[in-house]
Amino acid sequence: MSEKSRTLADLPIGQSGYVRIVNGDGCRRRRIIDMGITPGTEIKIIKAAPMGDPIEIAMRGYSLSLRREDAQRIELLTDGEAKELREKAVLSARNLELKAKGSLTHSADEDAPYHRRAAMITEIMLKGRCKPGSCSGCREEGVCPICEKNGTQEGHDGKEKVRLALVGNPNSGKTTLFNAMTGSREYVGNWPGVTVEKKEGKVKDTGLYTYGHDMTLVDLPGIYSLSPYSMEEIVARKYITVEKPDAIINIVDATNLERNLYLTVQLMELERPMIIALNMMDEVEKRGDEIDVHKLSLELGVPVVPISARSGQGVEKLINGIQGVINAAHAEFHEGFNIEPDDIYNGYTHALHHQIGDLVGKYAEQAGLPLHWAEMKLMEGDGETIKELALPEDVQQRVDKIVKEYSDSAPLGDSESMIADARYKYVTRVCAASLRRGHPIDQLTTSDKIDRVLTNKYLALPIFIGIMLLIFALTFGTVGAWLSELVSIFMDDVLTPYVRAALENAGAMEWLTSLICDGIITGVGGVLTFLPQIAILFFFLSILDDSGYMSRIAFIMDKPMRRFGLSGKSFIPLLMGFGCTVPAAMGTRTMENEKDKRMTILLLPFMSCSAKLPVYGLMAGAFFAKGRALVILSLYLIGIIVGILSGYLFRKTIFKDNDAAFMIELPTYRLPAAKNVFTHVWERVSHFIEKAGTIIFAMSVVLWFLQSFDLSFNMVQSAETSILGRLGSFIAPVFSPMGYGCWQAAVALLTGIIAKEAVVSSLAMFCGFSLSAGGGAVQSALSGIFTPRSAYAFLVFVLLYTPCMAAVATIRRELGSRKWTAFAVCYQILIAYVMSFIVYTVCGLFMV
C-alpha cells in the first residue's frame, strides 16, 4: 500500500498521522467528523485494546476509542502533504471569497459590541462587583449589564419566570452542576447516557442572586454535537429550537477545552442567550495550566464563569451572571450572545453560506429557525432541518446543486467536512488565544499512567475480573451477609415479638394480628433483610462509574462482545442492568444505532438485577450455605452466558446486517466524589425501601388475604385450600418437569412479575418460616417443596423470566412498540423455562 493511500488502521502504535479524508457516507461518517476527525487533523495511536480492537487515539487534547474498521475509513497524509493541502485550501478559499457578495469578515474586537459586553459581564462577575444594594460595577461602567441599574440594584417587581437549559458534553459535570444549582439529587455518573430524560429543577433562590426571577433549570442529555443521530441529541436539539429556553447554560470541561467548545460553537449558531460555565477549573490549576477567562469570553462573545461543580465554587457567581444574559437578551436580542458566522467561516464556507442564505431566508423565518443555523445545517445535509424548512422543490434542488458544486471542488472534502473543519479551526484559534499549558500536551498525566495498567494488554482482563470478584465477595459474603443477619435479627427477634405483644395486649382480633405480624412484617421485613447487600453493591458500582472506569470496560470488552453480536457500548447498560433494568434500559438511548439499542434492551433482563438478590440469598442460604457466594455468582454467569448466546442468535436472525460505529470518549480518571457516591447509593436504597413500603406492602396484604380466605371468604386453616392455593394448584403442573410443581412455588413466581422481592415474602408466608431462624430452619420449612436440585432450577427460572412490571413498562417505552415488548416477554419466559429444565436435568447427575 502506498503512503498516500494508507489509513489510520495502518498506523503503528505510538505514531502520528494527518487526516486526508473520511470515506463513506451517512450517520457513521458524520459521527466520526463530529468527534473532531476532519481533514488535516493530527491523530496519534495510543494503544489497542487487550484483544487488538478497538484502538485508542489522541487528538485535540482528548482520547477517543474507535474500531479498526472505522479507522480504515480515515485516509492519512504525510506531514508534507498536509501542509501543502492547507496552503492550497487557503488560496482557493480566498479566490472563492472574492466571488462572494460583499465582505464577510470582521474581527471579534471590532464592531462587535456584544463581544465586549460579554467580556464586561465576565469581568464584573469574576470581581464580584455587582451585588444587591451595592453595585460598584454600575458606578464604574455606567449601566451595569447584569442588573441594568445606575447605582443601587433594587431588583424586579414580582417574579419573572425564566427557563434555563443546561447543555454540555458527557462527563463534563453537567448533572453535578444541576444538583448544585437546584439542590436536586440525581444520579451522577461518568459515562455517556446517565441523564437520558429532560429533568427540571428550581434554581435555589439565595435572595442575593436571582434578582426576582423564578428560574427553572432543565437538565438536558449529555451530547457531543447537535447532529440528530442519537436520542440524546434529538431531545436536546428539539428543546432548544422548538421550546426556546430563555437562556442556555453551556457547561464546558476546562481540562478538555477544544473538544467541548465544538458544541459551544453549534449552540451559538442557534442564536439563544447563553453563558458558559467553565467547569473543573481546580483540575486545570493542578495541572499547571492557565485559562484567560476574560480573553476566552471576548473571543467567543459569550460570558464565561469559572466554576468547580463538585465543590460548589463559582456556582453562585454563575447564577448571578445568568441575570446579565437575560437582561442582555431583552436589551439587544437581535445581536444576542452569538458570534456572526463570518467570524468563524471563511473561504469555501463563507461563499457557500452566502449563496444558500439568499435562497432560504424567508423559509427559515417561517419555520422559526435562525437563518445562520438553517444555512449551516443545509450545508451539512441535515435531514431534520430539511424537513423543518419544507423548501419548495425548486429551491431545494438549487440548494442541493450549490452544495454539490462546492463539495466537488473543495480541497478539504465535501461540505460536511468543511463545516466541521471550519468550526474546529475557529475553536483552535480561541484556545490558542486563551489557554496556556504548563506542560507539553503529550506529557503523561497521572490518568495516563493509571490507564497503562488498567487497560494493559495482559493485565486488563484479570484486573477487571478481580474487581468484580471482590465486589461479589464483599456484597454476598463477609460484610453483606453479616449486615443482613443483623437486620434479620432485629425484624424477627425484636420488632415482630414487640408488635405481636402490643396487639394482643390491646385486645386486637386474631385476624388483624395475623395480618400485621404474619403478613406485613413477614413480607416487608423479609425483603428489607437484604437491604445491606443492595447498598454495598451500588456503592461499588457507583465508584466504578464515577471514576471513569466504566468507559474503559466498554473499550476492553468491545471485541469479545462483537463476536456475539453486541457492541462495547452495549456493555455499559448491560452492566448497569445488574443494578436495575429500568435505568439500564433508559441508558440505551445513547446508542445511535436503533438495532443495537433494541437488541441490548431485549438482553437486559438476563442481567440479574438487584431485586433478585433477596431470592438468591434466601434459597442459596437455605440449600447451599457453604457455597452460597459461588451459587449466586454462578447465577450471574448463567445470565451473562444466556445474554451472549441470545445476542449471537439475534444478530444471525432478526438483526442481520447491522454494524454500528463504536466511538466512545475515554474520560480522565477522577477520584469519585464521596457526596456523589453516597447520593447514588441513597437513591437506589431509598427506591428499594419505597418499593418495599408500597408494592411489597400491598402485595403482602393481598397475598395474606388470598392465602387466609377461601372462595367463600371464610378463613382457612391451610393455605392450600385458600384462593391463592387453588390458583397455584391450577398452574403448578407446568413446573413439574423442573421439580417445583407445587402451588407455593407457582404463586411465588406469579407475584414475582409484580416485584421480584415479592417471591421471598410469598415463600415466607406460604411455608411459615422466619428469616432470622437461620439457614437450617429455612431449609426445613422449604424442604417440603424444594430439593437442592429443584431449588437451583427455581433460581435459574427467577433469573431469566419476565422482569418486574416497572421494567416491562420501561422496555415498552424505550422500544416504542407493543409487538417488540410482547416478543421480549415471551422470549424471556421461554428461555427461563428451557434453561431451568436443562439445569434440573443436568444437576440430576450430581445431586438429588
Model-predicted segments: where are they?
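Juxtamembrane inter-helical linkers in multi-pass membrane proteins
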Residues: 489-497, 551-581, 656-680, 724-726, ...
